[in-house]
Regions:
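Asparagine-centered strand-capping/turn motif at beta-strand->loop junctions
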Residues: 123-125
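Beta-strand-rich N-terminal accessory domains
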Residues: 1-35, 120
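Short, surface-exposed linear segments at secondary-structure transitions and domain or protein termini
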Residues: 11-16, 108-113, 145
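Short, surface-exposed beta-strand/loop "edge" segments at domain boundaries and coil↔beta transitions
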Residues: 2, 23-27, 88-99, 151-152
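Extended, loop-rich substrate-binding clefts of extracytoplasmic carbohydrate-active enzymes
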Residues: 31, 35-113
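Residues that flank catalytic or metal-binding motifs in active/ligand-binding sites
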Residues: 13, 117-119, 137-139
């Protein structure tokens, strides 16, 4: 189950997301990363008009992502889709849109033996000037995991075990 929460003064926050057994897998404002919540785009190292921008660490105020408008819903026997537009700004130095993003969230219309949603994000420049996304070791679509993943067992080991799609542990 996923619930979206929207306010005109903030970005779209898509949370909580749960496993089929009901365990919440997304989190927000974790003590070690208080600037992350739900599902979001993390363009960590970028430039607009030769000035640094960042959409990962909100405390720096070098970038902001805001809900702009609800574009509508489509409902039929197969699915329900919601569409929203967000705008990215360069934060405190440039409050005008530099990037537009459309989210389309589709949920199957029939009961399935599992929970599922499809999220499509389309991003495009909002000005003639491009947002330059620089190479970095992380970035793009991100998920703020549940803070329970950071809890330690009796031996001081993380209770959560994160592996890549290749079955590798990132540590």
């Amino acid at each position: 189950m996923c619930i979206y929460s929207i306010s005109v003064s903030s970005s779209i926050v898509w949370k909580p997301c749960a496993t089929p057994s009901g365990k919440i897998i997304t989190g927000d404002y974790a003590p070690d990363h208080p600037h992350q919540h739900g599902l979001f785009f993390a363009w960590t190292k970028s430039n607009f008009r030769d000035k640094p921008t960042e959409f990962w660490n909100q405390k720096k105020k070098l970038g902001d992502i805001r809900f702009h408008q609800f574009l509508g819903k489509t409902e039929n026997k197969k699915s329900l889709s919601l569409q929203f537009e967000q705008i990215f700004t360069a934060g405190k130095d440039f409050d005008q849109p530099i990037l537009k993003e459309t989210w389309k969230i589709t949920v199957p219309g029939k009961e399935l033996p599992h929970h599922q949603f499809d999220l499509t994000s389309i991003q495009s420049c909002a000005t003639e000037d491009p947002l330059i996304i620089q190479r970095y070791h992380y970035g793009g679509m991100a998920i703020r995991g549940n803070d329970q993943w950071l809890k330690l067992d009796e031996d001081g080991n993380l209770l959560g075990n994160m592996i890549s799609s290749d079955g590798k542990n990132p540590k």
